[in-house]
């Protein structure tokens, strides 16, 4: 089975890109629309730090062309909880904020664990057990690690 190769960046609003990547005078509100026509995917780092409303995800979907994919970074609190119950609450809160409003443009979800976390097989087994098998229209993606 062939899989498409996607090219993207981690975000779309970077001051150093104003008037270099983006055309002069392009408003911040139009940067996603422009970038999504030059690339095929984006990793949304903002979801690691904040929650968003379903309308925001829907606006992102509408601003990007067919075939474009959003890879969301799960909220930072999702991967630091100590008990299964707290893990489930955090995961459910992240998944329940309206990410399925991205519909077919919802791509992989990056569950980034702190680089300081020592490997504990039981911890990761427990964490993986609270993830749903599917979200909306596609599989729930689980990834780990903390790249430099």
Where does each model-flagged region fall?
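Residues lining hydrophobic/aromatic ligand-binding pockets adjacent to catalytic sites
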Residues: 1-148
């Amino acid at each position: 089975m062939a899989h498409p190769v996607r090219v993207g960046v981690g975000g779309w609003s970077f001051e150093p890109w104003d008037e270099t990547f983006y055309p002069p005078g392009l408003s911040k509100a139009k940067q996603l629309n422009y970038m999504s026509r030059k690339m095929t995917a984006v990793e949304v780092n903002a979801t690691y730090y904040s929650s968003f409303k379903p309308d925001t995800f829907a606006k992102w979907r509408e601003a990007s062309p067919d075939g474009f994919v959003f890879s969301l970074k799960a909220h930072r609190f999702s991967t630091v909880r100590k008990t299964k119950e707290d893990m489930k609450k955090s995961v459910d809160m992240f998944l329940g904020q309206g990410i399925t409003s991205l519909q077919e443009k919802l791509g992989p979800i990056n569950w980034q664990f702190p680089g300081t976390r020592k490997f504990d097989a039981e911890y990761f087994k427990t964490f993986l057990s609270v993830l749903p098998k599917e979200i909306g229209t596609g599989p729930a993606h689980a990834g780990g690690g903390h790249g430099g």
